[in-house]
Amino acid sequence: MMLLGSPSSGGYGGKFAGASPAGGTTTMAPSAKQPSSRAPPPGITGGRNDLRILSPAAAAAAVGGLEMKKPEAEGIAESLQATHRKELEASIRKQLQGVELSPSPYDTAWVAMVPLRGSSHNPSFPQCVDWILENQWDDGSWSIDGSISTANKDVLSSTLACVLALNKWNVGREHIRRGLSFIGRNFSIAMDDQAVAPIGFGITFPAMLTLANGSGLEVPVRQNDIDSLNHLREMKIQREAGNHSRGRKAYMAYLAEGFGNLLEWDEIMMFQRKNGSLFNCPSSTAGALANYHDDKALQYLQSLVNKFDGVVPTLYPLNIYCQLSMVDALENMGISQYFASEIKSILDMTYSSWLGKDEEIMLDVTTCAMAFRLLRMNGYDVSSDELSHVAGASGFRDSLQGYLNDRKSVLEVYKTSKHSISENDLILDSIGSWSGSLLKEMLCSNGKGTPGREEIEFALKYPFYSTLERLVHRKNIVLFDAKGSQMLKTECMPVHDSQDFLALAVDDFCISQSNYQNELNYLESWVKDNRLDQLHFARQKITYCYLSGAATTFRPEMGYARTSWARTAWLTAVIDDLFDVGGLEQEQENLLALMEKWEEPGEDEYYSEDVKIVFQALYNTVNEIGAKASALQGHDVTKYLVDVWLHVVRCMKVEAEWQRSQHLPTFEEYMESGMVSLGQGCTVMSALFLIGEKLPEGIVELEEYDELFRLMGTCGRLLNDIRGIEREESDGKMTNGVSLLVHASGGSMSVDEAKTEVMKRIDASRRKLLSLVVSEQEGPIPRPCKQLFWKMCKILHLFYYQTDGFSSPKEMVSAVDAVINEPLQLRLL
């Protein structure tokens, strides 16, 4: 895995590999010796802002905010598919098999300062001292990436730490002089309150300045500036002096090298992990070891120095988090299907670590939440009990991430909280409550340009169960951080070659859009060819119907499934309009009679031209889909399609009769019909047999199928009712789930209270549906088929969660444009 590194005497190309805890390999990023100034060292083809999409058109479209026009997209797709797509996939596949970490000059310097036990004048790790001597940039600094054109607080901190390490062992006087000169030239950055700072910079940097002065080093800066930083440090310490929370103690232990003799070392070592480290952080462990001898801590550092040949990363081990982050990125960008076997291997290893309560997962809030979410959604049996330590806000605040109010950790646990599969999952519900509130507070307290703000806003507005996959993919591609580094105590560079991920995702999305546009053109022709556009009563929503299929069944080979989904969804809407608002009773009865016969009628059998148009379109479309599906399945499935249509239309007729007679059914009677009449069962079944899975004969008679349908139908019916009640009541329609609950209460329940009750039922059904879909137990219905029910549920949540998106002419326009029409516009990386 190629990540930018610092220069090293060994030259580029050498890797220091070893077995990682969760499988695969972990290696240190390669580096080169003594580059000139801050130009990229030999062997690096460009800085971190380069985009490695080799097609010129693709590169132009992916950087600089240029629009990717349709002809360009087609050319890019052809070029990438022909010459580079396989290379991109091979590169990503290799990255998934092993993790490469960035060298950390800051952490290496602190490890270098650990004295040899019994000989305080000698280093325990002379290899680290050698690495520092061999890896100074020509401007005098030490940093991960010498191609950075400007200094920052992280580079200042790393440079001062390296200077202290060399001075401690009285070597490298010229290196020290140049390092101090770099610090002096750029010291104004340390005084800038607005500059991005590593975690604990206000504690560790002044402490290092004091250590430098105490060891006889003359830092070429004004004493007033040093005094000012020390004063701010003392204020920070005094402000928290009365805070004895576990989170505060964790923070002090994490900054062990900066707090030094202010710490109670016996208390600090309570945070030591089984591998001997403090927080898997070499600098924290070295800071403790310099003041408190511990054999396990020494062994931890020794293992890292040996493993990485004299240099250490800023965190280790980090394998599980790195690999899960890559899996998450692939899923979020819509390209995970190309790496199914690699992802399964990663998740299998993660699950084994989960069951073994591996500290790399359990002691890191972000990793634990991400592991839970990815494992659950991929069918592994995981319990939210393992998240009980952050069930309340106080538990989160007791962690290091909680004390730091870490945005990424809060967002991760919030997203995870929405993956509940039981209405009694109090842990996830509690996590969702406090983390959602905290995210809203972050939005209020931070400006509009705050990093990650758009991601937080999206997560709060659209829980994962009310999103369409292709919409999410586009958002993540557009917002993708190709640099991807994370600022800890020092900068931690990305764990994978982000450009490869972005290049493949852009290519895949552009190909998809081209397919979608062609398929939508076909559907619009289908509407006209079948004269469906002549139906005055019907909502002309073929684009929205296609959106729901395209945004979920998005793989290129699923084109026929998408168009079948869209045509079926549109026909259910048309027939619903015929029974609900646009048709005479005789027309409704005539259509049902024709469907029950299911044969080509004579001209005199149609009550009206509208019935003729509707039935002919339905008859021809269902038979066509049925023939295609039957050929794929090896047995007749047309009968299932006809039967489900009959069930839907009969329920529509029952509800039409209720409306004409002003009959108010019980809520239970209404739901028995209503969860069918919405028509999702027809839509799902139209694609069920077309996605490449072999299904048993009699599938619709299975108990599991019936339960999947019931739960999906319940969500759909009630979501539709809760958003349509005002409109339907104004039209004089009383057969609505909310209205029926109010009526059944005898006036004791208000409309708002009835809506709350309906939302509870939706929530319970959705959770139960998800539990069936992600169940580890393999039943007769393959998981990809069960996922169609879940995807339909998500579509219904998006369409109806906040408004009646299907009936509103404007609500879905932006979604249609984003998935189908608008070219990608990527930010300058």
Swiss-Prot record:
InterPro entries, A to Z: Isoprenoid_synthase_dom_sf, Terpene_cyclase_plant_C1, Terpene_synth_N, Terpene_synth_N_sf, Terpene_synthase-like, Terpene_synthase_metal-bd, Terpenoid_cyclase/PrenylTrfase
Region called Disordered, residue ranges: 1-50
Keyword Magnesium (UniProt): yes
Motif residue range(s): DDXXD motif: 576-580
Keyword line: Lyase, Magnesium, Metal-binding, Plant defense
Sites where the protein binds Mg(2+) 2: 576, 580
Cofactor(s) the record lists: Mg(2+)
Domain of life: Eukaryota
Assigned EC number: 4.2.3.28
Tissue: Expressed in roots and stems.
Cofactor binding note of this UniProt entry: Binds 3 Mg(2+) ions per subunit.
Induction comment: By chitin oligosaccharide elicitor and UV irradiation.
Catalytic function, reaction form: ent-copalyl diphosphate = ent-cassa-12,15-diene + diphosphate
Compositional bias of kind Polar residues: 23-37
Residues involved in Mg(2+) 3 binding: 720, 728
Binding site for Mg(2+) 1: 576, 580
Xref: Pfam families: Terpene_synth, Terpene_synth_C
Biological processes annotated in GO: defense response; diterpenoid biosynthetic process
UniProt enzyme class: lyase
Domain notes: The Asp-Asp-Xaa-Xaa-Asp/Glu (DDXXD/E) motif is important for the catalytic activity, presumably through binding to Mg(2+).
Family as reported in the entry's similarity comment: Belongs to the terpene synthase family.
Note: Ent-cassa-12,15-diene is a precursor of the phytoalexins phytocassanes A-E. Phytoalexins are diterpenoid secondary metabolites involved in the defense mechanism of the plant and produced in response to attack (by a pathogen, elicitor or UV irradiation).
Function: Involved in phytocassane phytoalexins biosynthesis. Catalyzes the conversion of ent-copalyl diphosphate to the phytoalexin precursor ent-cassa-12,15-diene.
Entry protein name: Ent-cassa-12,15-diene synthase
Naturally occurring in which organism (per UniProt): Oryza sativa subsp. japonica
Organism ancestry: Eukaryota, Viridiplantae, Streptophyta, Embryophyta, Tracheophyta
